[in-house]
Amino acid sequence: MKKILALVLVFALAVCASAELAEEATVLTHEQYENAEVDSPVCVETYVQATQSWWDNTITVYAQSEDGAYFIYKLACSEEDAAKLVPGTKIRVTGTKIEWSGEVEIGDPTFEFVDGDPFIAEAEDVTALLGTDELAKHMNEKVAFKGVKVVGTKVEGQDGEFPFLYSYDGSGTREDNGVGADLYFTVEANGAQYSFTVESYLCGNDTDVYKAVEGLKIGDVIDCEGFLYWYNGANPHITGVTVVTPAE
């Protein structure tokens, strides 16, 4: 009887060990994540680069590893753990690969902290890739745009053009939601125009970048940094703006 119990125990331990190994094997490289079908389960290990505001036990995370980046939408997270999701922190994320208006992201995600040295991504200059299919390969990465020109944006029902808008249609204010409406501005590069956004839950109205965009003038030439979000085309979430040549 004791031998039978011992064999049962050994078998149970072996099953547990196999399950743990199988679970570890499900962690995908970024290439495997890219090749996974939309709506399929995914598990990745990556590093926090920035977060939006925590709310209702969720937080949206911009994450990146040496081999690629992820937009992790509404990560289930306590307020206590949210405070620990500082840039460089390594996490393992499990969720579903989803696509919305061209943006590929991880939905319904959960996470756990993983031991490891911190990693902070450097912004890659992708200015030359604007308007090319190659740009999408950098989706969600920390990127830079150099020497782009601010052009005017029109608002329906109003005369003139504006260097930026509070909300996509100009209907917002800097007081919305306590952090201000998202800021939208248009830049010209490589002979075409692109819409850039300051996502206020990422960089609110008290941040340097929000104030910098509020101070832009049509014709300013600027350098920008941010995360390459996608919405029916490139729509970067901008985290830094520097005017390099003021408008005349």
For every predicted segment, state its role.
Residues 21-248:
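OB-fold single-stranded nucleic acid-binding module
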Residues 4-19:
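Sec-dependent N-terminal signal peptides
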